[in-house]
Every structure is written in structure tokens, then in C-alpha cells.
Amino acid sequence: AVLDPLLTVEQLHERCDAGRQERVRAICTSLRQLPLLRERLGGQGGPKLIAAIGFPFGALPAELRLAEATWAAAHGADELDVVPDFSALVEGDSSGFAEDLAAITGLGLPVRVVLDMARLPEDLLAIAVEASIDAGAAGVQSGNGFGPPCQAEQVAALSGLCRGRCAIKAAGGIHHPELAMDLLEAGAALLGTSSAPELLQALRRPIA
């Protein structure tokens, strides 16, 4: 992930180049940085470019979230990580929650729904997962990276809810190889981290 708004253009280029060199699957970034990273990464080949939508808390009207997603699709995003309308969820409007997401999946890009496992109670988490899948999401993400590090137990719980119907992305505080491996073993297919190049380098080092 390259989401820090204080990164300079030179630093953004460095992170892109490091990701490409280490063959990361994708780079997630903000709408502000999206065109710059698209230009740096070019077209075919190399990491995919993910746009963060409604980031970090999803506190947007549905039309603005869709507008962000539409803009991202028009400016080179390959995939979308979407923070949903948690307010609709807690107010019992699961249909509105799902319809908001369905409008975005209708754009034709793969969509991951960014949940908040650190704060959502189990019943709302289960509803959110079902609504996300019903809306056509390709995956769900454990959190937005704020708060405590993601734990293997959270990924295992999410895996139990998803039951193989969509991919799981773990995110939040993943800076050490041991945690990364634990999350993958628990059922994560993808890891969201600002330390991807460093993690990949560490995992390739021979064990002394």
C-alpha cells in the first residue's frame, strides 16, 4: 500500500519501483496519488493498481462513493478497495449497504470490501460479509489499517464467514514475516501492508 499523503513524488516513485522490483501483486493508493502511480507503473505487466474508495472510514453518501469509484476506474485503477457505508449497517439497513456496493461492482472492476473487524460486533460482521458477497464483491478485507495489527484469529473467523465464496485480504500492522505467514496460514489470500518489499526480501533470506 502507498497511502501516506505526506510522501513526495520522489518517494512515491521509489515505492512503485520497489514494488515492481519485488514483484508485488498490486499497489493500493489514494485517488490523489492514483494518476501519478498509473503513469509510473505504465500499462500491461507489473503490479496492478488498486484505488482506495471511501477511505478510511466510509463516511460518504452513496453517490459520492460511487463517484469516487467511477473516477478511479476512468483514471487507471485495476481494482477497488471500498470502505462501505457502516452507518447503514449499524442502522439495520443491510439492503442499502448492499445496494451501495452493488452499484460499484457494476462498474466492472474487482471490488474488495474493507471491513472493520476490530470494531464490528460478530452479528454485524456476518451481515456485512453476506451483503458484500451478495453485492458481487470479489473479496473482503479485515480492516483499514488503523488500530491494532490484524491477527490470525480474525482471519480465521473471516474465513469461516466467507466459506470460500470470496478472497480474504488481511491488513493492518503487517510488518514482520512471522505475522505475515500466520495470516496466510489462517486463510488470507492477500496481505495489505506498507512494508511489502521489505517483507518479501526478509522471506527470501536463507535461515541461519
Where are these regions (language model features)?
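Generic structural signal for well-ordered alpha-helices
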Residues: 12, 16, 34-35, 69-70, ...
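Catalytic cores of alpha/beta
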Residues: 60-74, 120-131, 156-164, 168-170, ...
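Conserved N-terminal beta1-alpha1 strand-loop-helix module at the mouth
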Residues: 1-75, 122, 127, 131-135
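Alpha-helix-loop-beta-strand connector modules within alpha/beta enzyme cores
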Residues: 31, 35-57, 92-119, 149-176
